[in-house]
Amino acid sequence: MLMAALSVAQTHIECVGTATQVVSRGDTLFFFADEVHLRSKIGAADWYSTKTGALVQSNAEEIYPDDGGYYLRKAGVNYTPVYAFTYPDYAPTGLEATVTPYCRKTDLKLTGTIPAISYINENGASRTYARACTICYTTLAWNTEQWVDSVASQQETLRTGTYQLLPIYRATDVVVRWDDAIAEALGLTADSVVATLTEPHAITCMPTTITTTRGGSERSNEIDRPKEASVLNGSAPLEIAFYSNPTPAVEYFSWRIYHGSNLIVQRQDADIRYTFMDPGAYRVVHSVSNSYCPCADPVDPDCQQDSVEILVNVSESQLLVPNVFTPNGDGQNDEFRVVYRSLREFHCWIYNRWGKLVYEWTDPAKGWDGTINGRPAAEGAYYYVIRAMGTDADKNAKYVGIKASYTKGKLNASEALIGVYQLSGDINLIRGSK
């Protein structure tokens, strides 16, 4: 009886016994678990060989022929041929597998004897059935948090020679199984051969970052502050931890940080932490390598230094000063606070109308709550003096014409310098009602 059909085609010949049917390149092939046994669906007829064209048996309903192709002739009509094979006779012998790791690929080599399942069709053309094989192995895959085992498979045609596989990142058995569907349909165990990869050479990494956040209402006046650990841009100081997350075969690490085209940092640790201060665009280039894959030539298939680029952007400094605040306890505008980003220095002094210093502070995230020595200050105009340095200011920049004291009139004008803030002006304290 017909055990299973991998693909069904309409023929006038059927197989008898444990067998299965396959359609390949338009031809119908029968594979038998033991001897070939064919039966006509149109009653007794003449049986012919597709290979020789010779009559095999006349006026017969069933035949037990050798492997090959056969067609029926009845009443002068030739019917579509079939091609029959005793499957166990085509089992590979002496088949061995060896696996060779490289940086960008893995080679699997099969040696031994694989008998060809060949036949001559009704047109006299020689054909060979392409036997399917599946190559399976375990490698590593990134699941957004870590490397985990992942079973990979590759469909190929069974042959001797070398197969090229993807890079394999962990030790594993590489299993080659062939004719799975045919063997299953015949109730047989599919044959296989195993090669063991003990020392993978392939490497890669999956860098991740964690940015130190500055959240909360106490810093709500900082523009572009990093509120989430995933951000890669914002107000300085921007502190970011970089993690390589390498595959097991990685031996060496390289981190290079470029500000524009200038290399400013180079480290060889697996994980690093860096605080970005100067505004602008940065490139963080991470490379991994090992003794087998030491170079970065993308043309060389046997050499790899897997590099990943991460882009970071630091905001330019900015400092804005309000001219009024209302410390009445309603939760809105209750403090005199500047709006800022990317500052490395800050100092603010508050004077009353008589020039007396009433408050000062050095953290731009903080401000004046409108009290003097713990008591509410009188409503009216006050005077502020601010000096601050942005992270984009020249390291040798100096303040000009500002002292920590009040002088009636305007402050002396100074040469405009990027990132240097020398500000002064009136601030109006209005209490009103909540």
Task: Please tell me what each predicted stretch does.
Residues E239-Y243, S291-Y292, I310-K434:
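Short loop/turn motifs at secondary-structure boundaries
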Residues Q10-L38, A44-W47, K51-T52, Q57-L319, ...:
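Extracellular/lumenal mature domains of secreted and surface-exposed proteins
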Residues A4-L6:
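N-terminal signal peptide c-region/cleavage motif recognized by signal peptidases
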